[in-house]
């Protein structure tokens, strides 16, 4: 709850306050900041907190950037926006990006934040299904149109000797409808992230929720969320430098979130009014468990290993009809990332 206090200022104090307010009113361009639009993969959830931490703690500003964070409507749609330069830098599911590249999209990952798949079946605890392999066939699974989870789910089903046709897919228009389908028992489960929908739905509705990670059922995992860019955009003018500054401040935001989760939750709440402290902290804590793989351990945040890209490609090629790339660097580069402690260059 916000309270307003009346301050009675006089003389120099009042003048100082007015000067500070005037400074806040100065547009970013007048402060020497460069606009940098950044589109998320989805509506806000705890995984996005580090980007707001980087913005609200002034990390982007210290890099000379005025970062505008916009919500997305699914990785498939957002990848297309990056490909046509409507949003030249964005945050999407890595597998979805790989499929886009196979279809000719001129896009590439420049940082991978989530390096293990959080994909899960999320269901009501009083109607838990599927919790084991034998329960998957015939289950009603809710999914949004353009959902990033489809590629991973297809590979998951193939690994288990099944296909997507073995479940009843219920396609809905938006994330809220997907959740309502499960809450109203029109679907048995939705495909989502274990650190997002399950805890939030339970805390917001009072309905006890459960979830089963796909990797626990099949043993498979893939690279997950990535910052991607348009290939032509990054070669234009000073865009490569802008990108380096953005990534350095973002890495700093992720590190700060890892080290200061309580404060990060407070910052995220201010930007996502639908979230309370408990939900924000739960989602942030879950996110922080899947930042690295064995191959990327000890490397800078968002640095990804060639072996992990290879493993992800083999899985998607084998079970989800991904068109493979002979050169794995078509998918990614680490060249724009910074080394710890991710501070601005003097």
Tell what function each PLM region has:
Residues 4-12:
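N-terminal export leaders
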Residues 12-13, 17-20:
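Hydrophobic helical h-region of N-terminal Sec-dependent signal peptides
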Residues 21-30:
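Sec/Tat signal peptide C-region and signal peptidase I cleavage site
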Residues 30-184, 188-195, 211-215, 221:
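Short, glycine-/small- and polar/acidic-enriched structural segments
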Residues 95-96, 176-181, 186-274:
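Pocket-lining segment of extracytoplasmic ligand-binding domains
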Residues 109, 169, 257-268, 325-328:
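Surface-exposed patches in mature extracellular/periplasmic domains of secreted proteins
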Residues 237-319:
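Secondary-structure end/capping motifs
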Residues 309-346:
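Conserved C-terminal helix/tail region of periplasmic/extracytoplasmic solute-binding proteins
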